[in-house]
Amino acid sequence: VPQQPLVTYPTSVSGDCPDIFRVGDKWNINLADYHYVQVDAPGAVNPEVLQYDCGDLRVAKTMFDGKRRVILGWIGDYAEKKDSGNYEWGGIMSMPREIYADSKGILYQRPVQEAIDLFDNQVMAKDNIVLNEYMENVPLDYMLHATLYGNDDSKVSLLFRQAQKSNQEDAYRVSIDYKTGEIALGNRYREHKRVCEFDKSKPLDIRLFVDGTVAECFINDAYCFTMRIYDCKGTGFSFISEDMKVKIKDLSICSK
């Protein structure tokens, strides 16, 4: 018996490789990259397109383990395995994340505890970080966790896989603009950016996983940024800001 479609996608997104799951009273339909739509009854036409990730994550799928809904997908390749290359089809798998909904049903991500537990060898711990100070001799692969304290107009960046202090371009970058709410993960060739909602008066939690050719960054255990990384192999990092009132506290870097 013919049935009414659950949803008719907007033409602005690709609807291939869907993943469909229910949270509360709403059905979530993940689309080809990191966008999704929500419907509460069949027949929806052109519902609002939302995003649960930002960057290179593609065709993610979810599963339920009895307690949480876990999501993973592939992270795209770039031609010639260079940061400057054109985007290509295919890639490497992401780490598993927990995808969850807030009280309004909006989807967010945080790392599964099992992924955090893999990085159990602490190689650096600092209560306070000096801004604009280059720190080196960290592993190529690690998990960085820190708390940021900013102001209404603060701009702060975390540079990682940084080769040397004098060359900030030879690094990857997580940038946070408190005034606009824009957060980005990028390099000299591209930037994956979105506006995130966060209380500027409260500490901001950042957890960055750097593993092989992948960077996955979680802000406040809610907003996730995903990027393929090839070129930069530096063992340094730094927090950069012109606002000297910015505070970076409770830094921890752990390797596997």
Q: What spans do the regions from the language model cover?
A:
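Hydrophobic core segments of beta-strands in well-ordered, beta-rich domains
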Residues: 5-11, 16-21, 25-33, 69-75, ...
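Loop/turn residues immediately N-terminal
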Residues: 33-36, 213
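Flexible glycine/proline-rich, aromatic-decorated loop/lid segments
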Residues: 35-40, 61
